[in-house]
Amino acid sequence: MTSPFRSFVFKMRFDKQAITSVSRDQQVERVHRYLSALGGLHPLLGKWYLQGSSLQEALKTEVVAEAKNLERAAATGFDTEYPTWLSLSLWNGQEDPLQGGLAFNYYAHDMPSISSIDFEDAGALVSALDDPGALLVEMLRLTVTMWPEVDWGVIAPNKYYLDGQVFSDRQTIGWIGFCPHTLKPSDFPDAKELIDIPERGTIMVNFEQVMDERNRDHFRIVGTHDTKLVELGYLPMFNN
């Protein structure tokens, strides 16, 4: 029997002041390099298309092989009233989320809402892959390495991210998360793995299996680690 689809958040938050100091052209070029590099991680991430009015139209605007499509989308979306705003929405060409259908959203700005890179819905990768955690870690590692402006990253069930956190006004480390500080195993003994990212911080993997917010051990471990991060002064407010 096929397991029901479960929605997951995969959000990498920008420091707004830092990302808006990067020129639009540099950001677009970096997005293109990033999408190209994702293809080396898994075939599901090998092609990315602009959103279109129909499936046929969308499939005409692949951006990895045709960087000009990405550049045109960025130019079309420019608004003189909001010069720091850069928004790009792409899709990996898979229609069925259960087979890995995924969107990539890029929101760089200094507005009141969160500025971030998102994969929507990351539950698609959880559903489609036998070992999604390994790929998600590599996607997160690639992101924080390529974007020094990312100041937090989290992968967690959507229900937990929106309603289940211990600190409703703060971020969470989730199932897999990035903290821009060096974390010590002695402070997080229940974490499955702490991955040092030189000159950037630490990726924390809390457990090998996919996080289930209904699992009491999962809930306890993430809550305990979020509490420790608050004690260390490392768990940021929900928005910056």
Q: How should these model regions be labeled?
A:
Residues 1-49, 156-240:
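C-terminal interaction module
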Residues 4-14, 107-126, 201-203:
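Glycine-rich, often proline-containing surface loops adjacent to acidic residues and nearby aromatics
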Residues 39, 62, 76-77, 131, ...:
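Short, flexible coil/linker elements and helix-boundary hinge sites characteristic
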